[in-house]
A protein has these predicted regions:
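DPxDG-like acidic metal-binding loop motif
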Residues: 1-20
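Surface "functional belts" at beta-alpha junctions
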Residues: 19-112, 140, 145-146, 150
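Buried hydrophobic packing segments
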Residues: 8-12, 29-30, 117, 121
Length: 151
């Protein structure tokens, strides 16, 4: 689905001679909450005990790039020692059972919203932050593996 959506957006961008803007899902997810201080860990469930996550400060500056990680009880312990950490996204369900640090705050039932994506897109538009239509590809943390149909 993502490859098809990106291909359609690139085609429209090229044909209509309009800019292409991308909004990372985890960034849009981080913007779903406002915090006075501390860190935001935006996370998406990646099956089993794995999540895709990125870390942002209270001003939404990315402090750790997106990565795939296997959750353990020791995950994020260094960060939790120094500040309150707000975990947001559908990866929270599995995280809250593992991480019991007093500085961990779990915010459930938040998904990236169209409102936040529009606001982030508008900010990129105003700052002329556009993708190169010829070279833009969706960002995958794992290699795509096509599975042949069983029919």
């Amino acid at each position: 689905g993502l490859r098809i959506g990106v291909s359609a957006a690139k085609g429209l961008s090229y044909a209509l001679n309009i800019p292409l803007i991308s909004v990372p899902t985890l960034e849009a997810l981080a913007h779903q909450i406002e915090i006075p201080k501390g860190a935001i860990v935006a996370m998406l469930d990646a099956r089993r005990m794995e999540v895709y996550s990125a870390i942002y400060d209270a001003n939404y500056n990315e402090t750790r790039a997106t990565e795939a990680e296997v959750l353990t009880p020791d995950s994020y312990q260094e960060l939790l020692k120094s500040s309150i950490v707000y975990f947001v996204g559908n990866g929270v369900a599995k995280t809250k059972d593992l991480i019991t640090h007093k500085n961990a705050q779990f915010i459930e039932d938040k998904l990236p919203s169209a409102k936040q994506m529009c606001a982030l897109s508008y900010r990129k538009f105003k700052s002329n932050t556009f993708e190169d239509v010829a070279y833009f590809e969706p960002y995958y943390l794992k290699d795509f593996i096509a599975i042949p149909s069983k029919k």
